[in-house]
Design a protein with these regions (language model features):
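Small beta-barrel nucleic-acid-binding modules, primarily SNase/OB-fold domains
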Residues: 1-151
Length: 151
């Protein structure tokens, strides 16, 4: 098993529903800037694709992730490894201010994206194997009005 490390981070950019750029606080005033993090264990629809339907769901996932992160008072990254494209593979945890419904609890943002139907569990297998789960999420997001397809 690979070593895991925990850091306080500041999200500088939400790239898409499962990828963010962060500045990592290493302590002692040292910050490792603009590090790309691929959120471990999830897959979201692509927001940069020629498939216009998938793009709508991808943009909705990106927007939802941005909202989850903006609501947090602070964010922690648990890094697990580097992926095949050189990105950090990790889990993001949101910490909330007093008065927020989950104050005092550390929310795993990766898992929250799955619970909110914006992501599916994914461990690197062939993406065709999770396509059915993506389709089920689409139905939920259409039914609850999160995503509206134009005629």
């Amino acid at each position: 098993m690979k070593n895991t490390y925990e850091y306080n981070v500041t999200v500088s950019k939400v790239v898409d529903g499962d990828t963010v750029d962060v500045d990592i606080d290493l302590g002692f005033g040292m910050v490792y800037k603009k590090q790309r993090v691929r959120m471990l264990g999830i897959d979201t629809p692509e927001s940069r694709t020629r498939d216009l339907v998938e793009k709508k769901f991808g943009k909705a996932s990106k927007k939802h992730l941005k909202k989850l992160l903006e609501e947090a008072e602070s964010i922690t990254l648990i890094s697990h490894d580097k992926g095949k494209f050189g990105r950090i593979l990790g889990e993001l945890f949101a910490h909330h201010i007093e008065g927020h419904p989950v104050f005092g609890h550390r929310v795993n943002v990766n898992e929250q994206m799955i619970a909110d139907h914006h992501a599916v569990p994914y461990t690197g297998e062939n993406k065709d194997l999770v396509e059915g789960q993506h389709m089920a999420n689409r139905e939920v997001l259409l039914a609850n009005g999160t995503v509206v397809l134009d005629d």
